[in-house]
A protein has these predicted regions:
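Residue-level signature of catalytic and energy-coupling elements of molecular machines
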Residues: 5, 14, 33, 121, ...
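Divalent metal-dependent catalytic cores for phosphoryl transfer on phosphate-bearing substrates
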Residues: 105, 116-120, 125-179
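Glycine-rich phosphate/pyrophosphate-binding loops
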Residues: 19-30, 135-137
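Domain-scale macromolecular recognition modules
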Residues: 1-24
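Charge-rich, low-aromatic oligomerization/scaffolding segments with amphipathic character
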Residues: 40-55
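Pre-Walker A segment
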Residues: 80-133
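Structural secondary-structure packing elements that flank or coincide with functional cores
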Residues: 62-74
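Short glycine/threonine-rich beta-strand-turn micro-motifs
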Residues: 1-2, 26-42
């Protein structure tokens, strides 16, 4: 009842603020948040939980909770990017690139978290590079960043590979890592 609001105004305000569709089911206590964008979905989830916990669900409070959730999700992404760089042994990336990398934390592919897949790839690439005498640092960085284009592939034209190359070039990543 409170989530929907009078004549659906709360649901409409929430959908407008988050860009996520709200599906209210007959099952009590359940709301489905639907979006192809995993970051929007996470912002909506965090905001909805805060609204339900607070109990005061109204358009002004919705805006406030969504803005707080945006900041929280952004901060979580940045922290996850920093952790991934540490775990993968890839230091000294541009802070904005680390934040973009952290957005992969909210994405899955074939049921696996894309950020942790990238960390695993970086560590495997390092082992293989060591075995064959290749540059371990380049292999680590290339593997960690190989899916970076997936963070914005739904917002920008091109394949995630093409987008990733443009992102890495923008932040001055060396050509050996990009190729």
């Amino acid at each position: 009842g409170k989530v929907i609001g009078k004549e659906g105004r709360n649901v409409r305000a929430f959908e407008r603020a988050t860009g996520v569709d709200v599906l209210v089911d007959e099952t009590p206590g359940y709301v489905v948040l639907s979006s192809f964008d995993p970051i929007r979905r996470e912002i909506a989830r965090v905001a909805m939980e805060a609204l339900v916990k607070d109990g005061r669900i109204q358009p002004a409070k919705i805006e406030e909770c969504v803005e707080t959730a945006r900041k929280e999700v952004s901060q979580t992404g940045r922290k996850m990017g920093e952790k991934a760089c540490y775990d993968a042994g890839v230091p000294n990336l541009h802070p904005d690139l680390v934040a973009i990398l952290g957005r992969l934390h909210f994405r899955t592919s074939y049921g696996q978290n894309v950020l942790w897949h990238s960390v695993e790839m970086a560590n495997m690439a390092a082992i293989i590079a060591e075995e064959v005498g290749a540059d371990v640092a380049v292999a680590r960085a290339g593997a960690l960043l190989h899916d970076i284009g997936k963070t914005v592939s739904h917002e920008v034209a091109g394949t995630h590979v093409e987008i990733g190359i443009r992102i890495l070039q923008k932040y001055g990543v060396e050509e050996a890592v990009i190729l």
